[in-house]
Each structure stands twice: as structure tokens, then as C-alpha cells.
Amino acid sequence: MSSFFYSTKAAKKKLYPISEALSVQDVLDVLHTHSMLSQVFWPLSITEVLEEKTTVPQSTKFTVSSLNTNNKAALTSQANAVTCTEETFLGLRFTVTYRIIDSRYNPAQIIIHDIFQTESTSSLINSTTLPLETRLYLEEERSLTAPKPLSSLMKMKDGPIVKTRNLLFFLEEMSRNGADMASAIASLKASVTLAGEHGQEKTKED
């Protein structure tokens, strides 16, 4: 998009620990299985595949429909990551990349965000500067591109967006059930449905 008409805002990258029960391949299988990942990102919406490209880089385009919205989205795989781009009718484009980070190849000090050490996944994030253990982390990198008249009204949300919360919940469930994706997605959908019944709202950025 031309920067003359659009403005982009980026959030700080964040790392979230992945259960030691999961391997790099376990997580990659989730990130690169677009049909499953679309259910993780939009568990209560209807997703329809518009176009699927199986050559490198693998990509899938969807329409994502819920009660009041009908957006376009795309998932694109990279070697150790996946990028999700979602566009709304207002011309807003939300982009988030999830990347697997192995702590053995990263600096000794980094900001760690762990939503599973709080009372529940809906609690506020604990953020601490700690030496990295030898384990895997999920890196979240996100940005928002909007037409300049709207960009001044848009703010990047603090904390994990809904897609990130869903993905972390899904991975945690996989770590408990032997990497069974079907059971993990069923648990996620049940959790999201229950949260909706209790009136939890999602923000525009999610």
C-alpha cells in the first residue's frame, strides 16, 4: 500500500513460552496447517477458502464471516513462522506474524510474557525480564495499516490479542493431550463459547 494514503503502526515484539512437552515440529504443524489454524484464530466464525497455494511459500486466502462482519484474510507460511493478514471493509489491514524462537540462539536477557502463570488466560499478563531457559517461545509481531484519515483514531492494543490468546490456549491443550489437534480445537471452541456467554468483548484489533 502506498504510504502516501496509508499509515502503519507496529506493536513491540513479544515472546510467550511454549510448553516443554511440545517440539518445534509440533508447533510448526499447527502454524503450517492453515485449515486448523483458521479455526484457532476464528473459532466461532465461518471461514471459507478462496484460494490455496501449495508451492513455497504456502498461502491460503479466506473469507471470515460472523454475525456482523465479512472480512478477507490470508495465512502465509515461512520456514519457522506464519503470517496472518486480515482486511476489513474500512480499509484496515491487521498483520500478525507468529514465529518459533529457540532460546539457545537468542540473547540471554529478554522480556518474557507468560499468560499461563496468571490465575487464568483472561488475566493480565505478567511481564518480567529473566534469563532465557533452554526452551521454545512463540514470538508475536503485529502491525496495523489504515487510511491516514483513520490512522489517528487507531491504537495498538496492549497485551496479547485474541488470536494470540487462542493460539497459546490451543498449544497448551495440545501439550496436555499428546498433541491431539482435534481435542485441542474442541477445548478452545468450548472455552470461547463459554467466554462469549459471560459477555467478554473483543477489541477491533482482534
Model-predicted segments: where are they?
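Noncatalytic linker/hinge segments flanking ATPase motor cores
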Residues: 55-60, 104-114, 118-128, 170, ...
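Fungal intrinsically disordered, low-complexity polar regions
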Residues: 1, 111-113, 119-129, 191-206
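Short beta-strand segments that buttress and anchor functional surface loops
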Residues: 61-66, 82-89
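Short, solvent-exposed secondary-structure boundary motifs
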Residues: 37-43, 84-91
